[in-house]
Amino acid sequence: MTPRLTADFWVRAYLARLQQANIAAYVTRKGDPTAGAVLVKLATLDGQARAFQRSFDLMSGSRVWVTLTEGPEPEVDAAIARQRRNDPDLWVIEVESRD
C-alpha cells in the first residue's frame, strides 16, 4: 500500500502555498483529519464560482482534479451543500481569485 498524506496535512500545506502566492483561501468546512476528501471552491469575485474535487483516473492511475460544478456562486454553494450532506468527512476550501 502506498503511504498517503492525511487530509489535514494536505489542507495545511495547500493553504500555506496559496498564502505564499498572496491568494486568499479559507477552510469553510473541516472534514475528517485523516482521510476526508477535499473539495476546492474557486470564487472568481464576479458572482461566479467553480468547485473542484479530486478523482482517480483509471486510465493513468493517478489522482486528478475534476470540475464538480460551475456557474453562479449560489448554485455552486448549493452543490457543495449537497456534497457535504452525503459526505460528513468532506473538507471544503474556498479560494478567492479573479484568475
Task: Identify the function of each model-found stretch.
Residues 1-99:
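Polybasic/polar functional segments that serve as interface/processing modules
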